[in-house]
């Protein structure tokens, strides 16, 4: 049954999901560097599955591909970052532990709402912009923030709340079109996945570049809105 529906883009979506699942396992085992690299890998798989679907003229009348993509995204970009954040905080007080649980739950809830709304809108219109911050954004921001060497517990909690709320907001985010910027982020992400260190003191340069590009995309559209 499944082989009649699954196509190359779906395999890429499953690779996205697999990367997210492995990121969860490594985060639980407190190997956060590998976990963050796997989250970035999941984002890269997610960024190409749609492109492959268009290039292969994939027909998806039953919406099998769209559903498998959304289910993969909630694992890789909702649950994985939430568990990653919880394990990275290493709470030293009951209040901080409770705060981190609430924030992580907020990420998952807003992620599910964001993906559900996207699927509903995608069925009815061909929007030029994303409505609300795209869910892969929170994953790559958290992962690169951790790898950057600038990670801070309180900043990551505040940032997670902000991004979660922006995911379910009405702020419009344009779909990526700056090819040069995309190539730069792709190269830097590849360096991070393969753990190729390019540092100044303790600052990971590729991580900083990707992080700042994502934060710029996050905030500039809020200002414009």
Spans of features found by a protein language model:
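Short, amphipathic, aromatic/basic-enriched membrane-interface segments that mark the entry/exit
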Residues: 1-11, 65-71, 123-131, 172-181
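Topogenic membrane-insertion module of multi-pass membrane proteins
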Residues: 1-47, 186, 196-225
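Multi-pass membrane catalytic core of lipid/isoprenoid biosynthesis enzymes
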Residues: 9-14, 55-114
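Active-site His/Glu-centered metal-binding helix of metallohydrolases
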Residues: 18, 44-52, 71, 75
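Helix-coil boundary and interhelical linker segments in multi-pass alpha-helical membrane proteins
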Residues: 22-38, 81-103, 144-157, 195-205
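Alpha-helical transmembrane segments of multi-pass membrane proteins
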Residues: 39-46, 106-114, 163-170, 213-217
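Cytosolic, membrane-interface loops and tails of multi-pass inner-membrane proteins
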Residues: 48-65, 118-131
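C-terminal membrane-associated helical module and adjoining short loops/tails
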Residues: 127-225
């Amino acid at each position: 049954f499944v082989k009649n529906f699954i196509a190359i883009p779906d395999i890429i979506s499953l690779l996205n999901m697999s990367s997210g699942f492995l990121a969860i396992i490594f985060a639980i085992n407190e190997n956060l560097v590998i976990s963050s690299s796997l989250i970035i890998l999941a984002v890269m798989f997610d960024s190409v599955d749609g492109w492959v679907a268009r290039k292969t003229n994939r027909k998806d009348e039953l919406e099998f591909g769209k559903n498998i993509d959304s289910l993969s995204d909630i694992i890789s970009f909702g649950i994985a970052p939430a568990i990653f954040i919880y394990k990275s905080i290493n709470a030293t007080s009951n209040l901080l532990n409770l705060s981190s649980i609430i924030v992580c739950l907020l990420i998952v809830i807003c992620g599910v709402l964001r993906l559900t709304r996207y699927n509903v809108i995608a069925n009815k219109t061909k929007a030029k912009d994303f409505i609300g911050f795209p869910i892969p954004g929170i994953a790559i921001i958290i992962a690169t923030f951790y790898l950057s060497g600038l990670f801070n517990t309180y900043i990551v909690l505040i940032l997670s709340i902000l991004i979660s709320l922006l995911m379910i907001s009405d702020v419009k985010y344009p779909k990526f079109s700056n090819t040069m910027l995309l190539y730069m982020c792709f190269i830097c992400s590849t360096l991070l996945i393969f753990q190729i260190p390019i540092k100044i003191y303790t600052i990971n340069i590729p991580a900083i570049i990707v992080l700042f590009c994502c934060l710029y995309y996050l905030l500039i559209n809020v200002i414009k809105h």
